[in-house]
Amino acid sequence: MAESSEAFDLQDPIGTPALPARLAELLKLSVGGLRARFVDSELEIPRGVLPALREDPRAGVRALATILDKRRDAKRAEERRITRLTLFEREHWDRGIELVGGVDEVGMAPLAGPVITAAVILRRGARIKGVNDSKQLTSEEREALAPQIKEQAICWAIGEASVEEIDRLNIYQAGLLALKRAVMNLSPLPQHLLVDARRIDVPMPQTPIIQGDAKSLTIGAASIVAKVHRDHLMSEMDRKYPGYGLSQHKGYPTPVHLEALDRLGPCEIHRRSFGPVQRALGLDAASKQRSLF
């Protein structure tokens, strides 16, 4: 909760503490009225109001002030977090490099479905509250953030490596291929690329950042777009291949998925180079995925 630049002068003309008329009128509101005005509606609070609420003789009003204080502190903390998240981007923006891209992947560990990647170029100065490593967010938070990211992006793109490519190349190489595809699908291409702890075979300079999806706004944004896209895809696959629970676990090796795999056997989108799928097929474990990561 922010305090607006509008202020109430809390001194009368000769310097004696006084309540301005508008502030006095506000403080005549009931606890419910004050809650509706400042807590439920999240309107900005003119400077001078919050201190008055803290000193109000009504316990309910003082409780509202506590809520507003916590909301203000949380907003300030989020602003500081977003500032830290744009450190890598600002290093390039400040040197005149406007097209700073970020790329990330999801779906490396599942037993079923493709690897999905997303690449994003955010507008200079973009600040999207709530962006974080997609794994740290709820499904509802990701679904709310993905449209905001796309709206504030200069461009964004999806890449994919199929189940067949995963089985043929190995999961690590397939992930690199999907990352490259997402980047090369961007238009315009980035002038500089931020990558989560690896290097990609693309024709532009890049900065690998360990845990980049939690340290870079652009990589975090890409991780959210990729996760939402893959989740929707796996829900579609659940309708096509019922019985495995793909819309719930998204292909990851949960007990429910492993039980369904043993009961039903693999379907077309199961990764046959992964050990649990091979065991369900009765194949020798020695022929399992050559190198997962």
Tell me what each language-model feature is.
Residues 1-101, 105-293:
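RNase H-like, Mg2+-dependent phosphodiesterase core
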